[in-house]
């Protein structure tokens, strides 16, 4: 024991502690990278990210290329508001650097006055410091102002660009229903964009200021202590920077995983809010609590690993970028003073040596701190690489979807019970859509889901304006799929589809969508008030649409057309369905798809609505199980759910089924 204790010096203990922490770091890093691939026995909530195509999140040429691509969006022109803020920040950074140099020189002179007991010098330089305080404070706060404004400008530019792509045509629908590369786009469009913009601006500031400091201090120090000192510091920067960059590589990937788990956690919470009524009826709070806790547990486990990794990296960063850098600084600045034969200080007095040492030492200290900040900025750059990878992936997916390309796991034809095993493979977009008025015609169209699950192998029928069609069949037979193909939400896998343009085809769902806005907005959606004026439709005509669905009283009840309410809560189920029919009368399409949209409406009101649709020339495709609606239709399309269908004219001999 005595032989062992003699090695337990403070120095050896510190080295052992550092080695132990480094070992823990490497072990924890290995665990963190493989943790969620092995530990979780449950599949992820939304496995939308392909395992074979993981996004790179390291600082390399790919990262710089991606960052450059996004910067062109955020700074679109040479002369723009963002450029002005970039110049303002650059000017303020230069001014702040010169303020720092002046503060060092003036502070040294104040201390020289105190040590030399010169009341006159002390008062003069102290007065200079007091006089400069407002200017220095103004520079610092102008810098903060420029940084905050630039963050906001970048966020506005990037958000507008992404939403322009996201809300183009049906891209927002395709991303969630046709493509499975992006999970939780709301997380990317809100939090990730904000964090990316903040990280870019902070990195610009955290790199520009230290570089300016280094250039200026090298110039000042070279004349004071020679070129060898600054060169030694730069060499140390290069070696330590390469070493720390290598250690920080997992940060980018861990950042991507953090945002992914945050998105999943946000998704399950919003899902609970959206479906709260159904969950309450099922008394499913315990099950939902298990789901939320399970997702939250994955997030917490990852954050624990990330926190420990950052702690370990912070320990190493502090030693290498701060303390060892300071030691190197002391070694460099002390050389001309400890060298008794150095020509610069051969004839210097004690006071001159002291003043020269303070000034050179503080400049070198500031330079070493600047070098340390550059080294530490690598950590933020690695984190930025994670956000950049996610934003770039979102941009690429949006671009693909807007060009009709999407990626989704396709169902194997051998897994199907339909005669599709011998059929040629389905290719999204292989069919042809022909726009023509007053006709809907399916010509040898395979009805299939986006992942290739065939519902009907070959669908063919034709409907002209004026001939209403009743669509019936069990759940999952393809009724909603038919409408999605008609609405061009789903791709056409083959054949020819003749139909009117999108604006001449209207869809009324069982649970109508009530937009945010006024009572008028509920009737004319998606039009606005200006669109209503352009169409020449007065408020009196709108009132007539409400009267047609027996909702005229709601105008007085809710306080007029410009009343703003939460209409999803204010209107009952039947009122919402009738409001959707009033919306249909406002738009007057050639064809309308009614998907169980009168299930909460009385039979007499329903009968009047269908009669009025025929009167105004709206041809209907109706999904309903009510026998009372057969009299309003000329044809029926029955799907049996096993890939078969029949399209026939309704006659007196037709057996009506339903309730």
UniProtKB/Swiss-Prot annotation:
Residue numbers of N6-acetyllysine PTMs: 61, 260, 399, 533
Stretches of the chain forming a coiled coil according to its record: none
Residues with attached carbohydrate: 12, 106, 206
Residue span of region Interaction with PEX19: 2-61
Post-translational modification: Ubiquitinated by PEX2 during pexophagy in response to starvation, leading to its degradation.
Catalytic activity line of the entry: a very long-chain fatty acyl-CoA + H2O = a very long-chain fatty acid + CoA + H(+); a very long-chain fatty acid(in) + ATP + H2O = a very long-chain fatty acid(out) + ADP + phosphate + H(+); a long-chain fatty acyl-CoA + H2O = a long-chain fatty acid + CoA + H(+); a long-chain fatty acid(in) + ATP + H2O = a long-chain fatty acid(out) + ADP + phosphate + H(+)
GO biological process: bile acid and bile salt transport; bile acid biosynthetic process; fatty acid beta-oxidation; fatty acid biosynthetic process; lipid transport; long-chain fatty acid import into peroxisome; peroxisome organization; phytanic acid metabolic process
Membrane topology: Multi-pass membrane protein
E.C. code: 3.1.2.-, 7.6.2.-
Binding annotation for ATP: 473-480
Residues in ABC transmembrane type-1 domain copies: 85-372
GO cellular component, as recorded: mitochondrion; peroxisomal matrix; peroxisomal membrane; peroxisome
Pfam families: ABC_membrane_2, ABC_tran
Localization per record: Peroxisome membrane
UniProt entry keywords in alphabetical sequence: Acetylation, ATP-binding, Glycoprotein, Hydrolase, Membrane, Nucleotide-binding, Peroxisome, Phosphoprotein, Translocase, Transmembrane, Transmembrane helix, Transport, Ubl conjugation
Stored CDD domains: ABCD_peroxisomal_ALDP
Segments forming domain ABC transporter: 434-659
Protein family (similarity comment): Belongs to the ABC transporter superfamily. ABCD family. Peroxisomal fatty acyl CoA transporter (TC 3.A.1.203) subfamily.
NCBIfam families to which the protein is assigned, alphabetical: 3a01203
Subunit and interaction comment: Homodimers. Can form heterodimers with ABCD1 and ABCD2. Dimerization is necessary to form an active transporter. Interacts with PEX19; mediates the targeting of ABCD3 to peroxisomes.
Physiological role: Broad substrate specificity ATP-dependent transporter of the ATP-binding cassette (ABC) family that catalyzes the transport of long-chain fatty acids (LCFA)-CoA, dicarboxylic acids-CoA, long-branched-chain fatty acids-CoA and bile acids from the cytosol to the peroxisome lumen for beta-oxydation. Has fatty acyl-CoA thioesterase and ATPase activities. Probably hydrolyzes fatty acyl-CoAs into free fatty acids prior to their ATP-dependent transport into peroxisomes.
Stated name of the protein: ATP-binding cassette sub-family D member 3
Annotated source species: Rattus norvegicus (Rat)
Lineage of origin: Eukaryota, Metazoa, Chordata, Craniata, Vertebrata
